[in-house]
C-alpha cells in the first residue's frame, strides 16, 4: 500500500548513514529506558497506578478541572478556558496585546505546536523566542519537531554548526557539541535577561493545589520565567492529576520512559504569580472532550507525552518523524491524527508493524497497537482501504472457502518457483520490494501427512 508515509520514508532512507544513525540513537534511548525501569522493583505497579489515575482523572474532569480553577484563582492566577485552537491562540494574543508585549520567550510546548501558536502570533507582529535548545535550533532552521521529547533528534551536529555560523557567528567548522551548546546558551542568555513575558506549557496540573508542573533538563522554563512579571501557562485538559501524591507516580515514570534518566534535571512547580506580577493559565480542550466520549480510544488521553513509543517503534526509527502527516509522529501520533481528522491522516495507519512494542513500553498503558489495529479495520468504512489489498483478500477468501480449488492451487504453486524474476518482482508485489519471496514447497504439509511422512 503506497501512502504519503511510505513515500516520505523512502526519501528518508535514501541517506543510509543518517537513517542508520537515527535508528541506532533512538534504540540507545530505549535501552536506557529498559535499564532504568529494571532498577525500580515496583515499575509495573507504577504503570498500573498511572493508568488507573489517568482513567480516574479523565472520567472526573468536570470535578478536577473546576477544583484546579478554584485553587488557581485562590492562588492569585487568572484562569481561562479554550474550546479549540483558535480560542487558545486569541486568548494568548489578547493577554500579550493588553500588556503591550512585542517579543517574549517560550519554553517547549507541544500544545502550542498543536494549535500553531507561533505562526499566529508572528502574523500579529509578536516575536516568539523558543528557549529549549532543540526547539531553538528548529526555529532558526524553520523546521517542525520530528519527536515530541527530542525535537531535533534528526539534525546532525554538523548541520547545527553551520546554522550557528550563520546565525550566531560561531567558529567556522567547529562542530564540537559542548562548544555549540555554550554558544547557544550565550545567545539565549541575552533573550532571558530582558523578555517582556514568558510562556510555558505544563507536563502536569495538580487539581488539589492549583499548580502546574513543568519538567525540563535545561532549566529553560525557570530561566524564562525568572525575569518578566507576566507569565502565561497553557495545558491540555488531560494533563490534570488529582493531587501531589498522584503527581509523584508520574514524575517517577516520565523521565525514565522518555530519556532513560531517573528524573528530569528540573521539575518546576508554578503556583502563584511572582510579587507584583501576573500568572495567566489557559485550559485547552481542542478535541479532547470528543476523545473522552469515545470508549474505544479513551485511553489515548492517558498519554503523558514521554515519547517512549517513538523510541521503540521500528517504523518510526527507520522512517523519521517527517514521514508522518500529523504533527505528532509515531504510534501515539497515528492514533491522535485519526481521532483529529481520519480522512486527512488515514495514510499513517499503515506505518505500523503491529509488533506491540509501543504498548509494552507506555508508562500509562495506552493500548497504542490495539487502537491502530482498530483504525485499520475502519479504513474500509472510511472508503480508504487499499483497493489491491481488497481484491487480493477477496480472492483468498474465495479460494479458502473452496477446498478443491485451494488444493489445486497448492499443487500447482511450485511452478511459480521457475518463473522469470520480472514476473514475480513487479509493481503489484509490494512484499517483494524489500524482501526475497519464499519458495513454494514441492509438497504441502497436508500431502506429507496423508502419506505418513510426518507424524
Regions found by a protein language model. Name each.
Residues 266, 274-300, 316-425, 433:
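Ferredoxin-type iron-sulfur electron-transfer modules in oxidoreductases and energy-metabolism complexes
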Residues 1-296:
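The feature marks the mature, well-folded catalytic cores of soluble enzymes
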Residues 306-310, 355:
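Extended amphipathic alpha-helical segments enriched in small hydrophobics
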Residues 118, 245-248, 252, 307, ...:
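Predominant activation on well-ordered alpha-helical scaffold segments within soluble catalytic domains
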Residues 84, 309, 367-368:
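Helix N-cap / loop-to-helix initiation motif
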Residues 1-26, 392-455:
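Intrinsic disorder at enzyme termini
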Amino acid at each position: 500500500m503506497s501512502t504519503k508515509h511510505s513515500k516520505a520514508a523512502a526519501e528518508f532512507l535514501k541517506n543510509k548513514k543518517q537513517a542508520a544513525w537515527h535508528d541506532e540513537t533512538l534504540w540507545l534511548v530505549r535501552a536506557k529506558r529498559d535499564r532504568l525501569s529494571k532498577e525500580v522493583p515496583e515499575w509495573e505497579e507504577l504503570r498500573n497506578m498511572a493508568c488507573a489515575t489517568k482513567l480516574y482523572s479523565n472520567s472526573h474532569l468536570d470535578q478536577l478541572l473546576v477544583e484546579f480553577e478554584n485553587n488557581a484563582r485562590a492562588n492569585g492566577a487568572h484562569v481561562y478556558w479554550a474550546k479549540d485552537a483558535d480560542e487558545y491562540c486569541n486568548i494568548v494574543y489578547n493577554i500579550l496585546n493588553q500588556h503591550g508585549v512585542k517579543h517574549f520567550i517560550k519554553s517547549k510546548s507541544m500544545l502550542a505546536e498543536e494549535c500553531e501558536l507561533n505562526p499566529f502570533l508572528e502574523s500579529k507582529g509578536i516575536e516568539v523566542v523558543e528557549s529549549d535548545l532543540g526547539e531553538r535550533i528548529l526555529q532558526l532552521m524553520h523546521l517542525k519537531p520530528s519527536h515530541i521529547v527530542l525535537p531535533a533528534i534528526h539534525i546532525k551536529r554538523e548541520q547545527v554548526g553551520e546554522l550557528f555560523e550563520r546565525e550566531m557567528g560561531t567558529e567556522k567548522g567547529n562542530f564540537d557539541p559542548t562548544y555549540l551548546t555554550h554558544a547557544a546558551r550565550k545567545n539565549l542568555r541575552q533573550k532571558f535577561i530582558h523578555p517582556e513575558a514568558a510562556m510555558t506549557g505544563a507536563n502536569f496540573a495538580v487539581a488539589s493545589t492549583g499548580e502546574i508542573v513543568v519538567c525540563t533538563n535545561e532549566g529553560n522554563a525557570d530561566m524564562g520565567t525568572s525575569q518578566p512579571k507576566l507569565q502565561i501557562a497553557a495545558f491540555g485538559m488531560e494533563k490534570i492529576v488529582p493531587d501531589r501524591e498522584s503527581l509523584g507516580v508520574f514524575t517517577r515514570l516520565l523521565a525514565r520512559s522518555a530519556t532513560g534518566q531517573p528524573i528530569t534535571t528540573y521539575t518546576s512547580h508554578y503556583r502563584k504569580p511572582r510579587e507584583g506580577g501576573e500568572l495567566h493559565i489557559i485550559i485547552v480542550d481542542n478535541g479532547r472532550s470528543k476523545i473522552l466520549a469515545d470508549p474505544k480510544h479513551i485511553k489515548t488521553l492517558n498519554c503523558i507525552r514521554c515519547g517512549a513509543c517513538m523510541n521503540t517503534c521500528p517504523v518510526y526509527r527507520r522512517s523519521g518523524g517527517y514521514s508522518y502527516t500529523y504533527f505528532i509522529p509515531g504510534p501515539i501520533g497515528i492514533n491522535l491524527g485519526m481521532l483529529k481528522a481520519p480522512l486527512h491522516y488515514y495514510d499513517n495507519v499503515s506505518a505500523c508493524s503491529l509488533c506491540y512494542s509501543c504498548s509494552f513500553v507506555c508508562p500509562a498503558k495506552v493500548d497504542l497497537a490495539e487502537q491502530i489495529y482498530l483504525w485499520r479495520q475502519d479504513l474500509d468504512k472510511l472508503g480508504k482501504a487499499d483497493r489491491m489489498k481488497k481484491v487480493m483478500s477477496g480472492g483468498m477468501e474465495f479460494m479458502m472457502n473452496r477446498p478443491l480449488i485451494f488444493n489445486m492451487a497448492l499443487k500447482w504453486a511450485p511452478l511459480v518457483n521457475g518463473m522469470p524474476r520480472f514476473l514475480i518482482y513487479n509493481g503489484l508485489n509490494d512484499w517483494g520490494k524489500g524482501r526475497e519471496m519464499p519458495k513454494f514447497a514441492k509438497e504441502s504439509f497436508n500431502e506429507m501427512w496423508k502419506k505418513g511422512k510426518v507424524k
